[in-house]
Amino acid sequence: MAYSKKVMDHYENPRNVGSFSNSDSNVGSGLVGAPACGDVMKLQIKVNEQGIIEDACFKTYGCGSAIASSSLVTEWIKGKSITEAEAIKNTSIVEELELPPVKIHCSILAEDAIKAAISDYKSKKNKN
């Protein structure tokens, strides 16, 4: 199976690798995994007072497609509102990265990670 140039670019030069402090009330963290292949993805967002995602980062342990999917979505969600980020679907990730059918689960993980990070952020905001 050959990876697309976009997958290879994001795999070899991943964007936004890292982590934010979980104690920051403006940070939402999403940790998701796929038992089928062992991929684990942690995606974090930092949201400003206007509800715009001003920064995002990730740490992914998995295949090239999982890393590329994480890297891509961190680029996509920066500057978006929570609502806009929630609307990102795995099918858009598949299309952009030209993922083969056997790697579609990686794009689903990325979509799930976005939703989990947003859910965590919202639950922190509701507590304050």
Curated annotation (Swiss-Prot):
A Gene Ontology biological process term: iron-sulfur cluster assembly
PANTHER family for this protein: IRON-SULFUR CLUSTER ASSEMBLY ENZYME NIFU HOMOLOG
NCBIfam families: iscU
Free-text function comment from the UniProt entry: A scaffold on which IscS assembles Fe-S clusters. Subsequently gives the nascent cluster to other proteins. It is likely that Fe-S cluster coordination is flexible as the role of this complex is to build and then hand off Fe-S clusters.
Family, per entry: Belongs to the NifU family.
Oligomeric and partner information: Forms a heterotetramer with IscS; each subunit of the IscS dimer contacts an IscU monomer.
Protein name per UniProt: Iron-sulfur cluster assembly scaffold protein IscU
Gene: iscU
